From Swiss-Prot:
Lineage: Bacteria, Bacillati, Bacillota, Bacilli, Lactobacillales
Cellular component per GO, a single term: plasma membrane
MF terms in GO: ATP binding; ATP hydrolysis activity; proton-transporting ATP synthase activity, rotational mechanism
Name of the protein described by the UniProt record: ATP synthase subunit beta
Subunit structure: F-type ATPases have 2 components, CF(1) - the catalytic core - and CF(0) - the membrane proton channel. CF(1) has five subunits: alpha(3), beta(3), gamma(1), delta(1), epsilon(1). CF(0) has three main subunits: a(1), b(2) and c(9-12). The alpha and beta chains form an alternating ring which encloses part of the gamma chain. CF(1) is attached to CF(0) by a central stalk formed by the gamma and epsilon chains, while a peripheral stalk is formed by the delta and b chains.
Catalytic reactions of this protein: ATP + H2O + 4 H(+)(in) = ADP + phosphate + 5 H(+)(out)
First-tier enzyme category under EC: translocase
Role noted for this protein: Produces ATP from ADP in the presence of a proton gradient across the membrane. The catalytic sites are hosted primarily by the beta subunits.
Gene that this polypeptide is encoded by: atpD
Binding site for ATP: 156-163
Length: 469
């Protein structure tokens, strides 16, 4: 192990000098430094980011640099940060370095570990399947279905329900799927991670789940690399065990945000809106590894925060290019009390073709979108002149569109404690059948309010009956 000395500490950036004759550590190598805290030696991991010349390197700390001083000895480990992989990770909670943070016993020193930096699978190793992943959420299954082994992005501004939707997907898919799941919390609230951990523990899903967290209070180095830690654990199950893995990431924007902080600290010239010039490269390196190969599949569901609800912001715009399906959450729908607040016209999926979902499903989905689009066009006329100016056919269409809009809402299992209503899981065939009947006008006389926050059409009729219809 070659060793050097700290020459400068500026926040999470630490400069280390190895001397002009010494062997310099490679980029992305992990360095170790021990700091003295009240007589106890504490290990801090640094990752090499730049070579400055004259035997010096600039590193990013993965933990707080409080207590580091100039002159402290730094050791080069000779390899990248590596984290535990395999069966032993299931049911456990880790940080970016693969250290256990759930209060349980540490991993043995000889546990199998993999480096967090590796190349994406080659072109000939990739595999594409065209099987729909049923979520039990009507608006998703009908209008923007997910693919097994595909990549899904949940886009939305602050407070429109991304994390609740991802938790419902964990509830519905992880419990039905029965396979292995990896949840990665990137720069989000610790409270949400804690809630999710206890929910998973109560439901028993934790036994088949590995959880990795680098939350809001962590230094930018940890937030930037924690997504790679979760991905490394998922890749092992895919490549070595040939498993079909579910990878949940909340939130990809925080990965970009941390990269932006690190880039500024390293002195790189910012690009558009102050983001790092390497934004597309960093996103590509992460996203290209999240893929399905001939050995196994990774189905990833990623929450992506949209700053100020601006979809043209470089961070969400860069992520768009990598996804098979997008679920767009809309603030206007939350204001109408429609949850999940999924925009049925803006959400998209490459799975919505007759070859993949079938002719009937495709036709019903297209007709639902046509009715909603026409309703959107008529809203200006209604706002200015009122409903009376519409033709009879248009009045019928508006009534159906409003019923469809409300019927796209649904009660969630994970929101039961807030709504007081039990959650509902609707099979995809039932969803298609129910929307087809609404489009045919079978429920034109049922009050609109009966369609809010329900599961299948039977719930609507029961609700209408209780309302005295």
């Amino acid at each position: 192990m070659s060793s050097g000395k700290i020459t400068q500490v500026i926040g999470p950036v630490v400069d280390v000098e190895f001397g002009s004759d010494a062997k310099l550590p490679e980029i992305n190598n992990a360095l170790i430094v021990y700091k003295d805290v009240n007589g106890l030696k504490t290990k801090i991991t640094l990752e090499v980011a730049l070579e400055l010349g004259d035997g010096a390197v600039r590193t990013i700390a993965m933990e707080s640099t409080d207590g580091l001083t100039r002159g402290l000895e730094v050791l080069d480990t000779g390899k990248a940060v590596s984290v535990p992989v395999g069966e032993s990770t299931l049911g456990r909670v880790f940080n970016v370095l693969g250290d256990v943070i759930d209060g349980g016993e540490d991993f043995p020193a000889d546990a199998e570990r993999n480096p967090i930096h590796k190349k994406a699978p080659t072109f000939d190793e990739l595999s594409t399947a065209n099987e729909v992943l049923v979520t039990g959420i009507k608006v998703v299954d009908l209008l923007a279905p997910y693919l097994k082994g595909g990549k899904v992005g949940l886009f939305g501004g602050a407070g429109v329900g991304k994390t609740v939707l991802i938790q419902e997907l964990i509830h519905n898919i992880a419990q039905e799927h029965g396979g292995i799941s990896v949840f990665t919390g990137v720069g989000e609230r610790t409270r949400e991670g804690n809630d999710l951990y206890w929910e998973m523990k109560e439901s028993g899903v934790i036994e088949k789940t590995a959880m990795v967290f680098g939350q809001m209070n962590e230094p930018p180095g940890a937030r930037m690399r924690v997504a790679l830690t979760g991905l490394t654990i998922a890749e092992y199950f895919r490549d070595v065990q040939g498993q079909d893995v579910l990878l949940f990431i909340d939130n990809i924007f925080r990965f970009t945000q941390a990269g932006s902080e690190v880039s500024a600290l390293l002195g790189r010239m910012p690009s558009a809106v102050g983001y790092q010039p390497t934004l597309a490269t960093e996103m590509g390196q992460l996203q290209e590894r999240i893929t399905s190969t001939k050995k196994g599949s990774v189905t990833s569901i990623q929450a992506i925060y949209v700053p100020a609800d601006d979809y043209t912001d470089p961070a969400p715009a860069t992520a768009f290019a990598h996804l098979d399906a997008t679920t767009n959450l809309e603030r206007r729908l939350t204001q109408m009390g429609i949850y999940p607040a999924v925009d049925p016209l803006a959400s998209s999926s490459r799975a919505l073709t007759p070859e993949i979902v079938g002719e009937e499903h495709y036709e019903v989905a297209m007709e639902v979108q046509r009715v909603l689009q026409r309703y959107k066009e008529l809203q200006d006329i209604i706002a200015i002149l009122g409903m009376d100016e519409l033709s009879d056919d248009e009045k019928i269409l508006v009534g159906r569109a409003r019923r469809i809009q409300f019927f796209l809402s649904q009660n969630f299992h994970v929101a039961e404690q807030f709504t007081g209503q039990p959650g509902s899981y609707v099979p995809i065939d039932k969803t298609v059948h129910d929307f087809k009947e609404i489009l045919e006008g079978k429920y034109d006389e049922v009050p609109e309010d009966a369609f809010r926050g329900v599961g299948p059409i039977e719930d609507v009729l029961a609700k209408a009956k209780s309302m005295g219809y």
